[in-house]
Every structure is written in structure tokens, then in C-alpha cells.
């Protein structure tokens, strides 16, 4: 099940809804509130009621450290107590992606990173920094 928790990007909820419909995947949407922890809680309850094996909480992208948005993720984490916390990062961000990953790991205890666009340009080397920094922890 997908849970639409990106309440900031215009049309993010609509985009996730279309994707879920195309793939015949259940999706929890709430266009009536911008309270991300509430939406997450509702989606979590719906997933349990429907016996979902997997729940993905699609949250707003964060290109740099934004304390309010990271705090929002901490609240979401407390609401649903996830088994996995994955950061999806654009390798083109280079060193900034490493800084984001470090902060997210410190605050959320990441269990993994999905790095996109690693073949797009030279900044794809950020993945080596992720690996190196993770090995140091």
C-alpha cells in the first residue's frame, strides 16, 4: 500500500494516485489535511485493516537539511514505527546528498539508501562517499 504524505509539492498526491491506479496498487490519500503524521496514522490503520504486507509512505523531497521537515519525519516514525527507513537521494546532489544522508541517519536511524541517477554525471561518486561514511559508523 502507498500512503501519500507529500503535502507540499503541487500535484504530488495526484501523481501518486495515478501511479497506484496504473499498477493496481492500493493507495491512501487525504486531501483534507496537511498533517503528515495524521495521514500516516490513517494510512497505517487502513493497511492493517486491509492486510497489506508492505506500506510505503511517500513523503516530500528534501534537497537540503530542513529542520521542520526532518522533525515531521520523526513524528511520522513515532506514529508508525517502521521496520525500514530508506532515503531516496539524487546522486547529482554530490556532497550535499552525503550531508543529507548523515543528518537523516542521525535523526531517523536509516536502514538504507536508494541512490538515483548515479550514471547522470560525475557527482554520482557520492555513492562512494555514502559507502565510506557508512562503513565508519
Where are these regions (language model features)?
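Nucleotide-state-sensitive switch-loop elements of NTP-binding domains
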Residues: 1-84, 98, 109-110, 125
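G-domain G4 guanine-recognition motif of GTPases
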Residues: 3-5, 60, 89-92, 114-121
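General alpha-helical segment detector with a strong preference for membrane-spanning helices
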Residues: 10, 94, 120-121, 137
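Glycine-rich, charge-decorated loop segments at or immediately adjacent to ligand/cofactor-binding or catalytic sites
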Residues: 93-100, 127
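Amphipathic helical hotspot of TIR/SEFIR-family domains
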Residues: 101-102, 116
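Conserved small/polar residues in nucleotide/adenosyl-binding loops
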Residues: 130-135
Amino acid at each position: 500500500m502507498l500512503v501519500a504524505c507529500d503535502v507540499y509539492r503541487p500535484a504530488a498526491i495526484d501523481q501518486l494516485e495515478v501511479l497506484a491506479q496504473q499498477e493496481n496498487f492500493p493507495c491512501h490519500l487525504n486531501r483534507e489535511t496537511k498533517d503528515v503524521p495524521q495521514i500516516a496514522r490513517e494510512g497505517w490503520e487502513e493497511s492493517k485493516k486491509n492486510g497489506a504486507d508492505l506500506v510505503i509512505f511517500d513523503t516530500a523531497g528534501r534537497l537540503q537539511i530542513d529542520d521542520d521537515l526532518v522533525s515531521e519525519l520523526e513524528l511520522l516514525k513515532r506514529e508508525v514505527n517502521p521496520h525500514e527507513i530508506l532515503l531516496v537521494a539524487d546522486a547529482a546532489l554530490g556532497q550535499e546528498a552525503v550531508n543529507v544522508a548523515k543528518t537523516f541517519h542521525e535523526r531517523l536511524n536509516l536502514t538504507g539508501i536508494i541512490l538515483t541517477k548515479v550514471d547522470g554525471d560525475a557527482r554520482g561518486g557520492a555513492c562512494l562517499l555514502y559507502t565510506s561514511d557508512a562503513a565508519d559508523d
